[in-house]
Design a protein with these regions (language model features):
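General marker for long, soluble alpha-helical cores
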Residues: 1-291
Length: 291
């Protein structure tokens, strides 16, 4: 079968279907002796001149028709096409290309996934951040966890679009500082401010597993918001009984109501302490008189 392209440049111009930029790409294809099949893929007026350029460059880089057809699709813009073409030129497998050759990824996201492939990340690692809901900055935080040797379980704790890149970094920093999964989980909470996350992380890094942290983990395990769990943990550390605090936690009181109740419980403790102190002081005074 004759696969020669028979149209002349004059024929193409006379058709009047193409812009000057598109014509320039078609003319380059003709001058480079593209086959009929290659030219038929290239000379599509629905492609912009920039998209045609990516198709042309694919053929000039030695890609086959089947390879170029992976990205010669109107669902991709020229920048997305460029990222896919780069992967093909670098001999990525079909499986690797399929991870990011999706229109829902913008060119920057495609670049980060392609860059991961070029740095020999495996499919499981790539899937940790190959999500169009992640920004480039979030992807970089996940890549850093991979680079630093965190386990998949550790990375999965923060590889979630609900965390912004700064919150992700706080969780990552905890693991890099040697904190365990159990120590990091209490502050891996997207509802916490960056300041709250940082305060918790730096506190536990400095003080370790003290009584306050144990109480905090107790109430975070009940899925209480960090601010609420913190109030109860401080109350427990001050001496209020866990039975009373557990009761308050179960009732879902507002923070204002909880603070009101805890204030009264604190006053009761203070009153009892004073009574015990006076009683002890009076007893000592009586003992001294007997002498």
């Amino acid at each position: 079968m004759d696969n020669r392209y028979e149209k002349t440049i004059e024929n193409i111009i006379d058709e009047g279907k193409f812009t000057h930029g598109q014509l320039a790409e078609i003319i380059i294809g003709i001058k480079n002796n593209f086959s009929k099949e290659q030219m038929e893929l290239l000379e599509n007026p629905e492609f912009t001149s920039g998209e045609m350029e990516q198709i042309r460059l694919g053929f000039q880089n030695g890609l086959t028709i089947n390879q170029v057809e992976i990205y010669a699709d109107r669902k991709f813009n020229q920048h997305q096409m460029w990222e896919i073409r780069e992967g093909l030129i670098n001999n990525f497998s079909e499986e690797q290309i399929s991870i990011y050759a999706k229109p829902e990824f913008d060119p920057v996201q495609m670049f980060e996934i392609r860059n991961g492939i070029q740095h020999k990340l495996n499919t499981e690692q790539l899937q940790l951040y190959a999500n169009p809901k992640f920004t480039r900055e979030q992807m970089l935080e996940i890549q850093e966890g991979i680079k630093q040797g965190l386990s998949v379980q550790q990375i999965q704790l923060y590889a979630d679009p609900k965390f912004d890149e700064h919150q992700m970094n706080e969780i990552l920093s905890g693991f890099l500082a040697g904190l365990t999964m159990e120590q990091v989980q209490p502050y891996a909470d997207a509802s916490m401010s960056l300041y709250e996350m940082n305060s918790y992380r730096t506190y536990i890094e400095k003080n370790g597993e003290n009584e306050y942290i144990q109480f905090l983990k107790r109430y975070r395990a009940l899925d209480l918001p960090m601010k609420y769990a913190n109030i109860l943990a401080q109350a427990a550390e001050s001496g209020i009984s866990l039975n009373k605090l557990d009761y308050i936690a179960e009732k879902n009181f507002s923070i204002e109501q909880t603070k009101f109740l805890l204030d009264h419980l604190q006053k009761d403790i203070a009153t009892k302490t004073n009574e015990e102190t006076h009683k002890y002081a009076g007893k000592n005074k009586g003992d001294m008189k007997d002498r």
